């Protein structure tokens, strides 16, 4: 609903005091919200750089500084900037999906299952990047089944079951919560 893909049955979604409900997806992106979808969804036949430029499709300013910033965050993408996105590894495609979202200069970046299907070493790298994005002042809304990794990077966390919030608190507090440990962390 926040990205404008589904209309909520009731309520409001406020970002800096502006209600996003009923706004088109391009209006939502213009307001500072981007999405890194589950399964990466890169444009396979386009190059890495073309995919990144698509992330900035609503912008009218120069992209050079932001391309450089994404390439600094993901040096591997710089090495492959002219390679077709469909030939990248799963981890590289995830980096590209995150980089594409960053090209819109978001205030809020939503990430849906960024660890899905990735090797454990790649997952650790992705979560380090999530920390770095947040350190840069961008709010990250993380939807993730890897509760252990998600809670380690979360300032605030919410546990949902069948669409309802059942627990909330600081990430580190929920990481140490016995009910969360038993149900989601396997301990």
Label for each model-derived stretch:
Residues 1-187:
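Glycine-rich phosphate-binding loops of nucleotide-dependent enzymes
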């Amino acid at each position: 609903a926040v990205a404008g893909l589904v209309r909520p049955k009731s309520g409001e979604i406020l970002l800096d005091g502006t209600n996003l409900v009923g706004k088109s997806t391009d209006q939502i992106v213009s307001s500072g919200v981007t999405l890194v979808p589950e399964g990466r969804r890169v444009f396979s036949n386009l190059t890495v750089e073309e995919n990144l430029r698509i992330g900035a499709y609503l912008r009218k300013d120069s992209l050079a500084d932001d391309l450089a910033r994404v390439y600094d965050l993901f040096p591997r993408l710089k090495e492959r900037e002219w390679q077709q996105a469909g030939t990248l590894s799963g981890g590289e495609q995830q980096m590209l999906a995150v980089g594409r979202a960053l090209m819109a200069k978001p205030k809020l970046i939503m990430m849906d299952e960024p660890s899905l299907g990735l090797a454990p070493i790649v997952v650790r790298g992705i979560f380090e990047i999530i920390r770095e994005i947040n350190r840069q002042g961008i709010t990250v809304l993380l939807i993730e089944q890897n509760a252990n990794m998600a809670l380690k990077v979360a300032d605030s966390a919410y546990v949902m079951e069948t669409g309802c919030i059942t627990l909330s608190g600081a990430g580190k507090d929920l990481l140490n919560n016995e009910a969360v440990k038993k149900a989601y962390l396997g301990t």
